[in-house]
Amino acid sequence: MQIALVLLAIYGTTTTNTLRIDQCGENALGMQNGDIADSQITASSSFDKQSVGPQNARLHSELASGAWCPKPQINSKSYEFLQVTLNDTFLITSVETQGRYGNGTGREFASHYMIDYLRPGSQWIRYKNRTGHVYMDGNFDTTTPVIRVLDPPIVASRIRFVPSSKNTRTVCMRAEIHGCKHEGVTYYSTVPDGSRLDTLDFKDSMFEDSQIYTESGIKRGLGLLTDGFVAQASPFEKNQMNNSWIGWNRDTTDGRITILFEFEEVHNFTDVVLATFGNRIDGIDVIFSQDGKTFPLFSQISSSERQSLNNTSRRYDFRVPLHNRAGRKVRISIKFSSDWMFLTEVHFTSAANLTLLSEKIPPPSSAATQQLLVVCGIIFLTIFACVAYCVSVCLKRRQKNKSVDSNVKKDLIITHMGNKPTCHVFPSNGKLSNGHYEVANDILYARSQKSTLLSVSSKSTFSCRAIPPTWTDFNFPPPPEGREEHTYSQPVSPENSSNGSYKSVRKIQALKKYPSSALLIGKAIGEGKFTMIKECIIFGGLKCAHKSTKEEDCVHGTRALGDEIACLLQCGRHPRIVELFGVDESYNLLLEHVEYGCIRNFWMASEAPLDTEFLVRICKDIYSAMAYLESIRIVHGHFTPNNILMDGEFHAKVCSPRGPSHHAQLRYSAPESIVNNEFTHKSDAWAVATTVYEMAYQCRQRPYEELTNEQIVDNACALLDHQPNAVVPLMPTVFNYEILQLLTRCFRVDQLERPTFERLVKPFQD
């Protein structure tokens, strides 16, 4: 038996290995459609990685908060960038940008930007266009995509968008890149680099500032000879710009020039065409190198132009057949005898080189055949074992998911009560899975800022199917607006005091469930963003507050209820924390009814100012509740006056502990919460002290009353940077010295310098 072994070596179909822009088209490279993966999109910084990280900078996409936004504000001296790493070297013909629309919440865009790029073997290069400008005109609003054609185009494997602004401002971007794969020249160098004679300057004015050189010190890069533009007019015409031709004068060059072209890979070349201007080229020598170092003489091809009777200078193409010579570098030496020799473009063309090797091989022996069968059998068994293992793992996971579906009906939770308090929610983990935390002294930090978002059906069932986050899952818009209070979130799960996991299924099953027939639901007494609270009487006369979603199929409200119940189940009963009685058949919450509602409404309704003794007693109740939450490692996360309810005996109760995973009102948030999205017991200490500050003014003066939301964010940054112009609330002198000192320490920028709630509650108890 004879086996014919055929080796087919293909070096590529017929292609032009220089910039042929007309053949490239305007293909989008994948920012919008996802061909460019999230891992390929990075940035120098992000205001918040999840909501406005670089992965959200996709054109025409409303991911998370709608764009990439750098952490600092942008000015003319900034260097913040959005970087896209491509899988290969591409010819980039245009770029397209948008601002941050954020489904109507965004107002940020880049009016100007610069482009940096690199390719294999280069450093970062700042792009300049044919007229020498480096600034690109960007966007004028947040929605309209603006495309900018790159003239000359860019050859790059990585590209950076660098926003710039004359005035310091917040900037956000989305982007797309257009072009095609590049297989042509990656670098060239000329000796000499063009001639300058009197007022005539024909050097390569568009040559890249690549800062890379040959061994002999000649600068390497791309420029006029590979920009895809072929000039037709004479270089001496007055309206002809000198950035279309490179010219060499015979007197300054002795009529000899050398150009070295470099490619990423070895090519088989069929011809090279020189787009030139003059009366004749005396001779051309083309020599090839496959290893990039040696140029063997046997590879050299020489050509000359026929003598012409017409000595008039003209624009013409000079073609040299290259006979499928192989090379990674090509060196062209040109001789000319006219006064000037000009080039505007050099085109290489390569063609497929098919090498067929047919070789007769003797038939294998029986022993060799047996060995081959054994090897094939082992490979087959290995593949079969792997497939069987994967199938078994999938079946186990499916069974596990079914068991969870049958045990857990819905992820639940409560929010605060009172007259129209602010209520925001975040995407919760339906399974109430283990939180990941580290404890440093008495501070509870979340280690992971990512959460798996679990789908919740409209039929009160629970599913462990992971779904990707969308912009509605985040309430952390990076640039603050001046009209409404902003909220900030850190999507992680609260931690259990003992081992970091809730026994959620058992506790939910242990919750008392009341049938609808046993409930008499009355008028509304409060509402949040997705939830509402109504008066309710349970059969037997027990008065409570009925908490439900505003809309039946509101996923966000359902998640909010589920997240709050997780914290309340861990809290158990505490005299200063609102109690959870149970749920109804639809898993709406039945909460302790607190007679006078929110402390702010209570205080505003009081005809006469309340005395300091009453304020101290309220503070004692608050700090008692917060010290208990601290002891079981629950971070409240969004403390404001709306979270303090007044009962019939004029004691305060804290409601809506949500863990470090939820939102805080901007004016009550610690600087690390605003800037770094970090929520701990120490940030709670800041928020509670800010609430006490407002109560000390009878709830008639908001914190930072004179500052806009934008200025509050700037102030938080200034605090973290220890700038002297930063401000903090100044506590009024209505308390004794010890309490005043402790409350003042709550506004320390260094979290470790803030007192614990255990320490804060002591002077109020005394």
Curated annotation (Swiss-Prot):
ATP binds at residues 525-533, 547. Expressed in neurons in head and tail, some motoneurons in ventral nerve cord, in PVP interneurons, pharynx and stomato-intestinal muscle. One of its GO terms (biological process) is cell surface receptor protein tyrosine kinase signaling pathway. Disulfide bonds join 24-180. The chain crosses the membrane at residues 373-393. GO terms for cellular component: axon; perikaryon; plasma membrane. Keywords: ATP-binding, Cell membrane, Cell projection, Disulfide bond, Glycoprotein, Membrane, Neurogenesis, Nucleotide-binding, Receptor, Repeat, Signal, Transmembrane, Transmembrane helix. Residues 519-766 form the Protein kinase domain. One of its GO terms (molecular function) is non-membrane spanning protein tyrosine kinase activity. Belongs to the protein kinase superfamily. Tyr protein kinase family. Insulin receptor subfamily. Receptor which, together with svh-4, is involved in axon guidance to establish the tracts for the ventral and dorsal nerve cords during nervous system development. May play a role in axon regeneration following injury in D-type motor neurons. The protein kinase domain is predicted to be catalytically inactive. This is Discoidin domain-containing receptor A.
